């Protein structure tokens, strides 16, 4: 995802550099949006429709009070990208019967066999017993590859090293692994124009009657993903698409948009080679990360789960976070989990502005901060701006720490204060929708 994120981050930076949005500026931004989408290999017709919709909204819609036009433009860009990538509602993968049979398809080199193990691992972590069947009779290494992956994740496996009939192997696999909750059947990788192999997939489909058909697509094919999906759709229904190798190419955006255009639903993306590196695809969260907006929903859920007192929520949501509020919630902050994970959810690139050393310090020294805050007067807690060198020395002495410790805590406090202001701005946008 890094290449794709960098591509869109540059676009957002250019928009944020704009002081005033007149018609000429809007047209230049529109051209920049088009260039970015084309670099991501989004189909040309989708690029034109996307740009027309975004420009029309910017011309006609008035930003909410307190939101600069350039920030609202970024938010419009966010909403239109969500539509482009498949819409607001993420598609869920939920086995509904036992055994729930999943048939995996894909062209050669798409990462299909590895993805079958990733999907199995994903489901096993959620309590499902998963079995795996290899039906590839064309690629000799496929049997060994999937068997080794199955052993690695602890999944029952069925395959026939010297088997010749993929359809019969699939049938016997279903019969031999009856006790599982989910059965994943891997098929031979194929070129979409290879008629005989496509007929074989259809024969396996007819023989085992799968509950879900999953097409695995390599992100590097970009907009050609639509052609792959449509070719398979001529022979059997495609319920789910998994886009692999999203970590290695900027063309993944084009693949996502192209697949969404066909009506197929992307449910997962592969973000690395390890069996753990499969993520459920949520268009809204995916686009937020692309644009450097962070995962605000996840962050808000974490904060609200901890800050249960209404007046504290009001302080944070209003953008006012003083040291008294910080003191009240110092214990609750520890319930958020590792602060490094929390900061990753921050919007606007704030996470990058907080060093790893600061994050580690904040995790280790919450007790020290409580002592520092307890050494302050009520006036100092409510108005941190009055903390000069003399006051800091007195506070440090009372808390049994050094003045440097006090200053470091104040640095973390300032970063949290910035976070609360950002939350306030994003909440205004959400309320305006």
Swiss-Prot record:
Annotated positions binding GTP: 106-113, 186-190, 244-247
What keywords are assigned to this protein? Cytoplasm, GTP-binding, Hydrolase, Nucleotide-binding, Ribonucleoprotein, RNA-binding, Signal recognition particle
Family, as annotated: Belongs to the GTP-binding SRP family. SRP54 subfamily.
- InterPro entries referenced in this protein's UniProt entry, alphabetically: AAA+_ATPase, P-loop_NTPase, Signal_recog_part_SRP54_M_sf, Signal_recog_particl_SRP54_hlx, Signal_recog_particle_SRP54_M, SRP/SRP_N, SRP54, SRP54_GTPase_dom
The terms describing its cellular component in GO are: signal recognition particle
Which terms does the record give in the GO molecular function aspect? Answer: 7S RNA binding; ATP hydrolysis activity; GTP binding; GTPase activity
Q: Does the keyword Nucleotide-binding apply?
A: yes
CDD domains recorded for this chain? SRP54_G
Q: What Enzyme Commission number does this protein have? A: 3.6.5.4
Catalyses which reaction(s)? GTP + H2O = GDP + phosphate + H(+)
Query: What is written about domains in the entry's comments?
Result: Composed of three domains: the N-terminal N domain, which is responsible for interactions with the ribosome, the central G domain, which binds GTP, and the C-terminal M domain, which binds the RNA and the signal sequence of the RNC.
- Catalytic class of the enzyme: hydrolase
Gene3D superfamilies hit by this protein? P-loop containing nucleotide triphosphate hydrolases (3.40.50.300), Signal recognition particle SRP54, nucleotide-binding domain (1.20.120.140), Signal recognition particle, SRP54 subunit, M-domain (1.10.260.30)
Question: Where is this chain's protein located in or outside the cell?
Answer: Cytoplasm
Name of the protein this chain belongs to: Signal recognition particle 54 kDa protein
Annotated SUPFAM superfamilies: Domain of the SRP/SRP receptor G-proteins (SSF47364), P-loop containing nucleoside triphosphate hydrolases (SSF52540), Signal peptide-binding domain (SSF47446)
This protein's assembly is summarised as:
Part of the signal recognition particle protein translocation system, which is composed of SRP and FtsY. Archaeal SRP consists of a 7S RNA molecule of 300 nucleotides and two protein subunits: SRP54 and SRP19.
GO BP annotation list: SRP-dependent cotranslational protein targeting to membrane
Its function, per the record, reads:
Involved in targeting and insertion of nascent membrane proteins into the cytoplasmic membrane. Binds to the hydrophobic signal sequence of the ribosome-nascent chain (RNC) as it emerges from the ribosomes. The SRP-RNC complex is then targeted to the cytoplasmic membrane where it interacts with the SRP receptor FtsY.
